[in-house]
């Protein structure tokens, strides 16, 4: 099966596992996905992720609040293969007035909207997470 949008597939797998209160989710591995997951972990949206040596799949540990409430309320893919969305540093949108995070692919790697604005770099707006 050929996957046309692997990032959307990863976000959908996370969203579905999150809605069903699963603790872990498996996604096919790639360098871009590992960068995105590193940002999600740093921002506190996921607990952890790791890539076993013998496997080609990333294991993502999802994060929940003490009362089993989901930490990730929503995920939305913005830039798609059929319609790419680019923004300059000044045009990068705030998600829910700063309560969410926009993932931006820049020349400095995958950054959050706040980091991209601070670094004064624009790029492709990959997704919104809140």
UniProtKB/Swiss-Prot annotation:
Pfam families: Ribosomal_S8. The keyword Ribosomal protein applies. GO terms for molecular function: rRNA binding; structural constituent of ribosome. Keywords: Ribonucleoprotein, Ribosomal protein, RNA-binding, rRNA-binding. One of its GO terms (biological process) is translation. The keyword Ribosomal protein applies. GO terms for cellular component: ribonucleoprotein complex; ribosome. Part of the 30S ribosomal subunit. Contacts proteins S5 and S12. One of the primary rRNA binding proteins, it binds directly to 16S rRNA central domain where it helps coordinate assembly of the platform of the 30S subunit. PANTHER family: 40S RIBOSOMAL PROTEIN S15A (PTHR11758). Belongs to the universal ribosomal protein uS8 family. This is Small ribosomal subunit protein uS8. The gene is rpsH.
């Amino acid at each position: 099966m050929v996957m046309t949008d692997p990032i959307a597939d990863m976000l959908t797998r996370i969203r579905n596992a999150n809605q069903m209160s699963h603790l872990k989710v498996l996604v096919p591995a790639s360098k871009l996905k590992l960068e995105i997951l590193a940002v999600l972990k740093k921002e506190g949206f996921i607990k952890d992720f790791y890539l076993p040596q013998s496997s080609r799949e990333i294991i993502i540990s999802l994060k929940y609040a003490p009362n089993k409430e989901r930490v990730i309320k929503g995920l939305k893919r913005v830039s798609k293969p059929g319609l790419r969305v680019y923004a300059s540093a000044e045009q990068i949108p705030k998600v829910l007035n700063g309560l969410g995070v926009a993932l931006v692919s820049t020349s400095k790697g995958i950054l959050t909207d706040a980091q991209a604005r601070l670094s004064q770099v624009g790029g492709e707006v990959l997704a919104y997470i809140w």
